[in-house]
């Protein structure tokens, strides 16, 4: 069975549904839109709060970091049927993080949010067309390569975070606006975009194989993870380019 590059979406999640209890493309799309709506709403709330009350806004920001990480990690271990609860919780907490982060970027580089949102969804729909046209075909080798790349990127993120917290040092160049920093962001965005191909394949196979309907929430959660990741990386790339 093929595995998705997204650590949350893989064929091991499949069960079998019956009749109206089966997973559908429309169901996944609707639930993904709902999660995005929740995220956008809480992002607006946190962004507005931090401009009026910076202290409370900062508390919401760190609460969002802790809550979204806890929700994302718990999704690996819990019964997938609980995704109907964990998904919206994750989206709400993630919005608390994205609001202040996006607001800070917008303060430094006016118009950057609109650019980042446009590029994120533009990339999403481009990869959907690429997938439907089978220009890039999902394969076991692609899944393994993406999983390895995502693992390496996560290790770099973790090492960078630990160094920033525990020492005055950081991993050189990757956060800067030089060639290496911009190149790193482009690589991360490319990996994230290719992850969509495997995610779409997971969802399509789930529908074809009659996966249970509760996996619509799980699939929507997986897509949400990728969309948020891409948005943040595109925002960072645009900031690097505009700071040159």
Residue positions per predicted region:
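A hydrophobic alpha-helical transmembrane-helix feature that marks the membrane cores
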Residues: 1-244
